[in-house]
C-alpha cells in the first residue's frame, strides 16, 4: 500500500471534495478519506474494480494511507481526510470533462458499455451537467472517474433514462434483445472482481470514525441485491 507523503490541496469540484495528494511513488492522486464517508470509499473501490475488470477506461486507482505522523502535522482544515486507508484516483493530465458537443465523437459501443455498467451498479451520477468522464481531444479517448454514487438505494430508472449522458445509446440496448444478451454476458465477467473487491475491503472501513465505535452506514446485502439482478432476470426492468 502506498503512503501519502504530502497533502497539497483540496479539489473544488465534486460533492466529496477530494484531497489532492502526492504519494510515495511521486504521483498525484485525488484522494477520498474519512471525510467522504465510508460508503463513498467502498463504492469507489468496488465500482472501480468492476469497471477495470470489464476493460472500461477507468482512471488507475490505489489504496493509499495517511500515516499518523503526517496526520498530526496537518492543519485543522486538512485533517478532515482522516487517518488510515483512503481511496486514491490517479490524477489525469491533458484532459477535460466531456462536453455534450463531443459525444458524437465517442464510439457507440463504448457509450453503450459505460451506460450499461452504470445501470448495472445503479449509478445515476453521469449526466450532461456532471459527466464524470474525462476526455482527451488529442486522441479522442475517455477516462471514467467517480463511482462513489454507485449502488444507490434511491436509484430512479426513469431519471437514469432521461439524464444519463449516454441515454440514447442505452435505449438501443433496451430495444434490442441481442444487445441485451451481449451486455449481460459482458457484465457477468465483472462478478469475480466484485466478490474479490468485497472480500478485500480495508477492515477499518467497517467503522465510520477513527475510534472504531460507530459502524459505517453501509449495507453489503443491498449491494449484493443490486448485483444479483443480472442472474434473476430483473436487470433491465424499469419498474
Q: What is the predicted role of each segment?
A:
Residues 1-100, 120-124, 150:
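Conserved ATP-binding subdomain of kinase catalytic cores across diverse folds
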Residues 10-14, 110-124, 179-189:
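A short, terminal or domain-edge coil/loop segment
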Residues 57-61, 69, 115-119, 143, ...:
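Short, surface-exposed, polar/charged, turn-prone segments marking secondary-structure boundaries
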Residues 48-53, 79, 105-111, 161-166:
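Short, low-complexity, polar/charged sequence segments that are solvent-exposed and flexible
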Residues 65-67, 130-137, 180-182, 188-194:
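A general structural signal for short secondary-structure boundary/capping elements
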Residues 142-239:
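C-terminal catalytic region of ATP-dependent kinase domains
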Residues 67-79, 97-99, 104-108, 136, ...:
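Short, structured coil/loop segments at alpha-helix boundaries
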Residues 93-156:
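Conserved kinase catalytic-core segment
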Amino acid at each position: 500500500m502506498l503512503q501519502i507523503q504530502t497533502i497539497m490541496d483540496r479539489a473544488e469540484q465534486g460533492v466529496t471534495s477530494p484531497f489532492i495528494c502526492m504519494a510515495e511513488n511521486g504521483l498525484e492522486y485525488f484522494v477520498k478519506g474519512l471525510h467522504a464517508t465510508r460508503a463513498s470509499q467502498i463504492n469507489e473501490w468496488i465500482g472501480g474494480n468492476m469497471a477495470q475488470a470489464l476493460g472500461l477506461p477507468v482512471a488507475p486507482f490505489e489504496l493509499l494511507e495517511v500515516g499518523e505522523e503526517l496526520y498530526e502535522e496537518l492543519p485543522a482544515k486538512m485533517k478532515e481526510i482522516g487517518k488510515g486507508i483512503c481511496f486514491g484516483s490517479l490524477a489525469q493530465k491533458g484532459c477535460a470533462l466531456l462536453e455534450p458537443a463531443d459525444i458524437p465523437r465517442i464510439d457507440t459501443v463504448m457509450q453503450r458499455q459505460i451506460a450499461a455498467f452504470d445501470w448495472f451498479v445503479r449509478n445515476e451520477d453521469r449526466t450532461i451537467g456532471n459527466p464524470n468522464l474525462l476526455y482527451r481531444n488529442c486522441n479522442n479517448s475517455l477516462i471514467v472517474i467517480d463511482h462513489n454514487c454507485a449502488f444507490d438505494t434511491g436509484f430512479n430508472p426513469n431519471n437514469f433514462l432521461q439524464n444519463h449522458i449516454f441515454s440514447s445509446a442505452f435505449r438501443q440496448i433496451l430495444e434490442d434483445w441481442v444487445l441485451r444478451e451481449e451486455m449481460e454476458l459482458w457484465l457477468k465477467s465483472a462478478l469475480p472482481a466484485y466478490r474479490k473487491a468485497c472480500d478485500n475491503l480495508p477492515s477499518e472501513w467497517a467503522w465510520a470514525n477513527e475510534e472504531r465505535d460507530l459502524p459505517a452506514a453501509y449495507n453489503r446485502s443491498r449491494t449484493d441485491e443490486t448485483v444479483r439482478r443480472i442472474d434473476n432476470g430483473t436487470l433491465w426492468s424499469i419498474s
